């Protein structure tokens, strides 16, 4: 009854004033806690401390605009490689040394941003914009040894990368960027020519083929230490396949046109098949009774005529070839029973086979020279690396006139979902076991590209 309305009113005003004063402090703390310094590092009111020149690559560079706040940062093209350019750009340096955000835009591509604390972080980087409508996001580029022929995840973040024109294979962690070079003994590594790998986790082994030494090498999957070498009588060893039913490893031999059979325990070649055409990719049937062989051609004397070979494991001979002639390169299982996918390099297509009917169900057109294919662990997508046309006069070991492409095929409908441009001759390709990442190797750029899959 003795309350004073005037005092209450003044007290209420004071409380509201205190709240209003606390709002900026609250926002400041939220920004600091979340790591989002965009409200704190706007270039508008920041004091500059000169500029720093950086050099990095942009894909694509034509039509691309780079902004810092409202300011457009011009760049100078130093080198061009089709749609990719090495550029030079002056970036403002601020006294507060807080993070800055570069925003990139280009017609036909999704807007992108790149955050750095120091300008030198951009040096030697690749910024690749994602095409409009694409659901895969470019994350990073890592340099490798010369000519990364294939890639294989050995866990969720580490890759085994055999090098065709180098002395072994790189094992690279896509989170840290740390690389370890694995090489066999001196007499082997100097011959170069490392091609493909298999990982056998149940026996803690990582195998790699070396075609120019006619050999296969075994490393410890955990420690990466060298363990053994298997010398082969087959010539130019390529694809490796582990048979868990018989505890054997198969290796396709390009020049001798046969397949070496290796005892995994003894690390010895125990036999070879007869000539079976020019073998490339290999796949074992689920019951282990048949071995499917991607014939690049019918023989070394022919430029075409390769089909899908069916080899009987009991009879130890080729019992059938199916499908149209071409240059079959790689085979993977489909997401349903009796379904497999085969890449055909000469015909720019992926063939879908019904193994029960022993025929091609469908052909899916893709870009030139499709080679490695990989089914995502979740079974949703088949990924295809397409090298693109060879150089018109100097073959595939010289950069061609256009860049290669990566295709994504929806396995429910077996239709192309999306595709985008990669580097010079994308060749190796794999998806991480946890479904998060797609990695490809740009064979003639000596690098890999890492993409984040949608939803992961």
UniProtKB/Swiss-Prot annotation:
> What's in the GO CC field?
cell outer membrane
Signal sequence, renumbered to the chain: 1-34
UniProt keywords (A-Z) are: Cell outer membrane, Disulfide bond, Lipoprotein, Membrane, Signal
Q: Does the keyword Transmembrane apply?
A: no
Localization of this protein: Cell outer membrane
Keyword ATP-binding in record: no
What's a BP term from Gene Ontology annotated to this protein?
Answer: positive regulation of plasminogen activation
Q: How is it used?
A: May be useful for detecting a broad spectrum of Leptospira infection in humans and animals due to its presence in several pathogenic serovars of L.interrogans including copenhageni, canicola, hardjo, icterohaemorrhagiae and pomona, and also in L.borgpetersenii hardjo. May be used for serodiagnosis of both early and convalescent phases of leptospirosis infectious disease.
Cystine residue pairs: 346-347
Question: Pfam families attached here?
Answer: Lactonase
Role this protein plays: May be involved in virulence. Binds human plasminogen (PLG) and stimulates its proteolytic cleavage to enzymatically active plasmin in the presence of an urokinase-type PLG activator in vitro. Activated plasmin has proteolytic activity which may help the bacteria to spread throughout the host by degrading extracellular matrix components, facilitating tissue penetration and invasion.
Q: What is this protein called?
A: Antigen Lp49
Classification lineage: Bacteria, Pseudomonadati, Spirochaetota, Spirochaetia, Leptospirales
Gene (UniProt):
orfC
């Amino acid at each position: 009854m003795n309350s004073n309305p005037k005092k209450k009113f003044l007290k209420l005003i004071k409380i509201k004033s205190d709240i209003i004063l606390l709002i900026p402090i609250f926002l400041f703390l939220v920004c600091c806690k979340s790591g989002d310094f965009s409200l704190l590092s706007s270039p508008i009111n920041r004091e500059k401390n000169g500029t720093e020149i950086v050099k990095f690559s942009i894909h694509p560079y034509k039509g691309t605009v780079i902004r810092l706040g409202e300011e457009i940062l011009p760049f100078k093209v130093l080198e061009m490689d089709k749609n990719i350019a090495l550029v030079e750009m002056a970036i403002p340096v601020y006294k507060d040394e807080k993070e800055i955000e570069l925003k990139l835009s280009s017609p036909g591509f999704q807007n992108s941003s790149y955050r750095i604390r120091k300008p030198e972080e951009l040096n030697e980087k690749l910024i690749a914009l994602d095409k409009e409508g694409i659901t895969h996001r470019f994350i990073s580029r890592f340099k490798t040894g010369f000519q990364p022929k294939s890639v294989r995840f050995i866990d969720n973040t580490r890759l085994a990368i055999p090098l065709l024109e180098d002395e072994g294979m790189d094992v690279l962690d896509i989170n840290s960027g740390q690389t370890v070079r694995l090489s066999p003994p001196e007499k082997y590594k100097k011959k170069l020519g490392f091609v493909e790998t298999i990982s056998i986790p149940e026996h803690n082994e990582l195998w790699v083929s070396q075609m120019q030494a006619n050999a296969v090498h075994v490393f410890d999957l955990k420690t990466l230490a060298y363990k053994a070498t298997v010398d082969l009588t087959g010539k130019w060893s390529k694809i490796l396949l582990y048979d868990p039913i018989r505890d054997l490893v198969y290796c396709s031999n390009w020049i001798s046109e046969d397949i070496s059979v290796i005892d995994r325990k003894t690390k010895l070649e125990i036999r070879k098949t007869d000539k079976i055409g020019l073998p490339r990719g290999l796949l074992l049937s689920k019951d282990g009774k048949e071995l499917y062989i991607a014939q690049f051609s019918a023989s070394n004397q022919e430029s075409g005529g390769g089909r899908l070979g069916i080899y009987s494991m009991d009879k130890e001979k080729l019992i059938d070839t199916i499908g149209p002639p071409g240059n079959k390169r790689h085979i993977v299982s489909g997401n349903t029973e009796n379904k497999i996918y085969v890449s055909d390099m000469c015909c720019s297509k992926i063939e879908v086979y019904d193994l029960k009917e022993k025929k091609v169900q469908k052909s899916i057109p893709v870009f030139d020279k499709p080679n490695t294919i990989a089914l995502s662990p979740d079974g949703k997508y088949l990924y295809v690396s397409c090298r693109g046309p060879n150089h018109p006069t100097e073959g595939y070991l010289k950069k061609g006139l256009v860049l290669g492409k990566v295709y994504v095929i929806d396995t429910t409908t077996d239709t192309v979902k999306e595709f985008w441009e990669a580097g010079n001759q994308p060749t190796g390709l794999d998806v991480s076991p946890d479904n998060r990442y797609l990695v490809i190797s740009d064979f003639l750029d000596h690098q890999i590209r890492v993409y984040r899959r949608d939803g992961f």
